[in-house]
From Swiss-Prot:
Record lineage: Bacteria, Bacillati, Bacillota, Clostridia, Eubacteriales
Protein name as catalogued: Diaminopimelate epimerase
One Gene Ontology MF term: diaminopimelate epimerase activity
Reactions catalysed according to its record: (2S,6S)-2,6-diaminopimelate = meso-2,6-diaminopimelate
Organism annotation: Heliobacterium modesticaldum (strain ATCC 51547 / Ice1)
One Pfam family of this chain: DAP_epimerase
Enzyme class: isomerase
Pathway where it operates: Amino-acid biosynthesis; L-lysine biosynthesis via DAP pathway; DL-2,6-diaminopimelate from LL-2,6-diaminopimelate: step 1/1
Domain of life: Bacteria
Protein's gene: dapF
Length: 281
């Protein structure tokens, strides 16, 4: 099996073209993801990205976490996929429609004057704010600055969906955020029947925040694109920031804009190819 290792701000993925047999016909990708994402016994990665044909968009993808679970969306991963298909001529246009479990997502390739790819801007769609859309247990309506009992502690959270569930917790010092202690508890909290990603956020300025993430199915990662988008939406709803914000993650910055005129969220950031290889299955 040929693969390409890529990353978006250190959130790293193994990308595989499975558009033709025999890879197209395989039904054990979840097991393969666990094996090859292992950083000691496999290639190593936060997830496995698979490319398939689509009758609804230019291409269809599957993304599998390192534990074999399948999230609805992944912002950093979709940027990597966009660069992968563009540079290989699989999709011969800059604006690429991708069929995902969260609907049709549209990344757009950004190039310099010489035509080299410098980044990807992704139309991430509209945020989903109602509890049943996240999903989150509780009375219908948005979940903004709500109390959540986690063990013996009570924390204030803001929850929403960017195609996948996110729970934001605001902190005074991002370096002291309890990512690895509180994060896994909130991920599996009964309030979130599909589990949730957990973002810890420090507001720096109206146009700047810092964020750390505990990803559902992957644990702590260097970056989370949908999490950065959710962070900006939640911060606007709380009155903490403007609609155009730079989100600083452990792996680097993402530029997020929640446009008022169409209610859609746009994410701009890098996608980098690290190496290529071949692995027997």
């Amino acid at each position: 099996m040929e693969f390409v290792k890529m990353h978006g701000l250190g959130n790293d993925f193994i990308v595989v073209n499975a558009m033709e047999p025999p890879l197209l016909d395989r039904e054990d990708w979840e097991e393969i993801a666990v094996r090859i994402c292992d950083r000691h016994y496999g290639i190593g990665g936060d997830g496995l990205i698979l490319l398939f044909p689509s009758d609804k968009a230019d291409i269809r993808w599957r993304i599998l976490n390192s534990d074999g679970s399948e999230p609805e969306m992944c912002g950093n991963g979709i940027r990597c996929l966009a660069r992968y298909v563009y540079e290989r001529g699989i999709v011969a246009k800059r604006r690429i429609e991708v069929e995902t479990l969260a609907g049709i997502i549209v990344p757009e390739i950004i190039t310099d004057a010489a035509g080299a790819v410098t980044g990807v801007c992704v139309d991430m769609g509209e945020p989903r704010l109602q509890r049943h859309q996240i999903p989150m247990v509780g009375p219908e309506g948005p979940a903004v600055n709500q109390e959540l009992v986690v063990g013996d502690a009570v924390v204030r959270v803001t929850a929403l969906s960017m195609g996948n569930p996110h729970c934001l917790i605001y902190v005074n010092d991002i370096d002291e955020a309890p990512v690895t202690t509180l994060g896994p508890k909130v991920e599996v909290h009964p309030a979130f029947p599909a589990k949730t990603n957990v973002e810890f956020v420090q507001v720096v300025a109206p146009d700047e925040v810092q964020m750390r993430v505990w990803e559902r199915g992957a644990g702590p990662t260097l970056a989370c694109g949908t999490g950065a988008c959710a962070t900006v939406v939640g911060s606007v709803l709380n009155g903490y920031t403007d609609r155009k914000v730079t989100v600083h993650l452990a792996g680097g910055p993402l530029h997020i804009e929640w446009r008022e005129e169409n209610n859609r969220v746009y994410m701009t950031g890098p996608a980098v190819e690290v190496f290529r290889g071949e692995l027997p299955l």
